[in-house]
Amino acid sequence: GYYLAPSEYFDLTLLGDYYTNGSYGMRVESSYRKRYSFNGRLSVRFENLIDGERGLPGYSKSNIYNIRWTHSQDSKANPYNRFSASVNLGSSNYFRESLNQINTPNFLNNTLNSSVSFSKTFRGSPSVNVSLTASHSQNTRSKTVNLVLPTFQGNVERVYPFVKKNG
């Protein structure tokens, strides 16, 4: 594998595995951070799995993957705009079949969840808040995927139309 730090804002890890039966795996991981602005982490994993001997009964070949991304914005960056993401999606059998993910908590976890949201506050009188949120839920046992496409929400500060502005 390789570890690179191309700048002070992010790093990159490239890892690969090769097994004698022809199976292989690749992992790309990166962390990024800009002080007082944002930070996050991205992980992409892919494996090509071969089981058995080619030409014999029981031979199988499969591809599995997992993508994780987290991003958060520092509240000091822009107090009126906010973006955050927590993404975890992949093959339904990734944690059961992966050669590099043999740990009980991940193996027993049956759901992969994701959420991405953006909100904005418009200053003024009255102030207006709007937000968009999208989410994803994946059950690895039943192999069902539920997507909630962007949901819009808007709020307006309470207005008192018959109250004098001065006094």
List the predicted regions and their residue ranges:
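Outer-membrane beta-barrel proteins and related beta-barrel translocases across Gram-negative bacteria
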Residues: 1-167
